[in-house]
């Protein structure tokens, strides 16, 4: 699971889910990528599930890049607890993903298998996604 080793503050404010992605909107490492179309919080478990779905489908010969990292804690109070008594304890680690962000990238020689692997990974994520291909002029 992806979690930070140490953080300066254990509890943070909830991040905003408005606006477009400021960077990371183009495929820069692999040939194909998964791009977010709606905003969402992606947990470390969802990132891991998508990674496993991709790598199991392509088996060997490909390379996967993960471009998001769950660096924000989300807190939760226990069930049947009265209001007050401070903020709850950290439960999940999330990555705040804005529309347009390329979250995963994949390099694989066969386009059909690569697209199927990315589709399987996109089904594990909590937002609408699309598969994008690297353009000829991109970095």
Swiss-Prot record:
Record's function text: Binds 23S rRNA and is also seen to make contacts with the A and possibly P site tRNAs.
This protein's name: Large ribosomal subunit protein uL16
Pfam families in the record: Ribosomal_L16
A GO molecular function held by the record: structural constituent of ribosome
Signal peptide (residue range): none
Gene name of the encoded protein: rplP
Keyword field: Ribonucleoprotein, Ribosomal protein, RNA-binding, rRNA-binding, tRNA-binding
One CC-aspect GO term: cytosolic large ribosomal subunit
Subunit field text: Part of the 50S ribosomal subunit.
Family designation: Belongs to the universal ribosomal protein uL16 family.
Segments for region (Disordered): 1-25
Biased composition (Basic residues): 1-20
HAMAP family cross-referenced by the UniProt entry: Ribosomal_uL16
Biological process annotations from GO: translation
Gene3D superfamilies in the record: Ribosomal protein L10e/L16
CDD domains, sorted: Ribosomal_L16_L10e (cd01433)
